[in-house]
Design a protein with these regions (language model features):
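Active-site acidic-Proline motif in GNAT/NAT acetyltransferases
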Residues: 76-78, 82, 110-111
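Conserved GNAT acetyl-CoA-binding A-motif
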Residues: 96-108
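Conserved beta-strand-loop-alpha-helix junction that forms the acyl-donor binding cleft
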Residues: 106-115, 133-137
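Extreme N-terminal starter segment of soluble prokaryotic enzymes
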Residues: 1-2
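Conserved active-site tyrosine of GNAT-family acetyltransferases
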Residues: 119, 124
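Conserved acetyl-CoA pyrophosphate-binding loop and the N-cap/start of the following alpha-helix
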Residues: 79, 83-91
């Protein structure tokens, strides 16, 4: 897998990947998420491509000056268990560390046991915190 920054022409393939991986939710419009990311540290929006130039993985990383974050880590279902997620996380960690990021945070849905174990194997530990959220912009996807 070759890792490179997201390009505008990747949009539909990336959203299809997210859909195949079960990452899409009605309350998060993926088109708007991508637009917003392209306005802030677009070089940290990564895709993985195979030898046929097919997008098979993605990660949307960012650094706010205090903590790094990774969202939308996805690996195509037919490419799992090949260490592609690990490769993408290693690259995101490297890029964030280059920017002086002292700690990387991420969120995983509590019922997603397979992904929880994936991150544990990468050395991530569960913090003793509760994640709160407040919707500031309502941008549900269209039905």
């Amino acid at each position: 897998m070759k890792i490179r920054p997201y390009q505008t022409e990747d949009r539909d393939a990336v959203i299809a990947l997210w859909d195949a991986c079960g990452l899409l939710r009605a309350w998060n419009n993926p088109y708007r998420d991508i637009e917003r990311k392209l306005g802030v540290q677009p070089e940290l929006f990564l895709v993985g491509i195979d030898a046929n130039q097919r997008i098979i993985a993605s990660a949307m990383a960012g650094f706010d000056g205090h903590r790094g974050w990774v969202n939308y880590l996805a690996v195509a279902p037919d490419k799992r268990r090949l260490s592609l997620g690990r490769q993408l996380m290693n690259e995101a960690e490297r890029l964030l560390a280059e920017r002086g990021c002292p700690k990387l945070n991420l969120q995983v849905r509590t019922g997603n046991l397979e992904v929880l174990e994936f991150y544990r194997k990468l050395g991530y530990v569960q913090d003793d915190v509760v994640s709160f959220g407040k919707r500031l912009i309502h941008d549900q996807t269209q039905a």
